[in-house]
Regions:
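Conserved micro-motifs of the catalytic ATP-binding
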Residues: 1, 56-59, 90, 94-97, ...
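Conserved catalytic submotifs in the C-terminal HATPase_c
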Residues: 73, 83-94
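Histidine phosphotransfer helical core of two-component systems
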Residues: 2-41, 61
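Short conserved segment of the HATPase_c
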Residues: 148-160
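Detector for a conserved hydrophobic position within an alpha-helical segment of the HATPase_c
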Residues: 179-180
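Acidic ATP/Mg2+-coordinating residue in the GHKL
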Residues: 143
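Short alpha-helical Gxxx[C/S/T] motif in the catalytic ATP-binding
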Residues: 171, 175
Length: 210
């Protein structure tokens, strides 16, 4: 990746010249190289996001209980500034899914929900697993943030559309692509009492016996 040498060169430049400059110019150098490093990091993130969006993945489908997948990923968010409140199903919710791809979906949705709730007095994300009226396995993730803008509600799954100042705008399009490859669907909405919701419906895995 040609971006990595740029990032390393900026860091090396700052390290080599810092002690050779007076304080004023050292600060200018530090700010400039810091800007380069941060912008290169943002570009690398965007390149990786575009790669995930553009490539045709090779999925390995296995039987999973969505309850368990959600539990596993939520463990990574324990102790954070945002409180996650799980409301999982009291019975297994079987799906056929690629483990890595589905964890990527869950991470993206949970991370976005937590970031969107940061401005709330007590940031909270409610995560529920159950079934919808069609009998599909349903994941619902709602936060107590300010909700989606009108533009996001209409164009969230279009590449490069984002509410976040540092977002790539490729997270939700990648999520939608993965969900559709699993035969599911995803939708966004705002709650009447405030906050945003993401709903993902996936085909229920029905095992047949010969």
């Amino acid at each position: 990746n040609p971006l990595t040498p740029i990032q390393l060169s900026a860091e090396r430049l700052a390290w080599k010249l810092h002690d050779k400059l007076d304080e004023q110019h050292a600060q200018i150098l530090s700010r400039s190289t810091d800007t380069i490093v941060k912008q290169v990091a943002a570009l690398k993130e965007m390149v990786e996001a575009f790669r995930n969006y553009a490539r045709a993945p090779s999925l390995n489908f296995e039987k999973h209980d969505l309850n368990r997948l959600v539990e596993e990923v939520l463990l990574l968010y324990e102790g954070g500034a945002c409180r996650f409140v799980p409301n999982l199903s009291d019975k297994p919710q079987p799906i056929s899914a690629d483990t890595t791809a589905m964890r990527q979906v869950l991470h993206n949705i949970f991370k976005n929900a937590a970031e969107a709730a940061e401005e709330a007095e007590v940031p909270q994300v409610n995560v529920s697993v159950g079934e919808d009226n069609d009998g599909q396995v349903l994941l619902t993730v709602c936060n107590n943030g300010k909700g989606f803008s009108k533009e996001m509600l209409h164009n969230a799954f279009e590449p490069y559309v984002t509410d976040k100042p540092t977002g790539t705008g490729l997270g939700l399009p990648v999520v939608k692509k993965i969900i559709e490859e699993h035969g599911g669907r995803i939708s966004l909405s705002n709650q009447n009492e405030g906050g945003a919701c993401v709903k993902i419906a996936l085909p229920r895995l029905v095992e047949t016996y010969a």
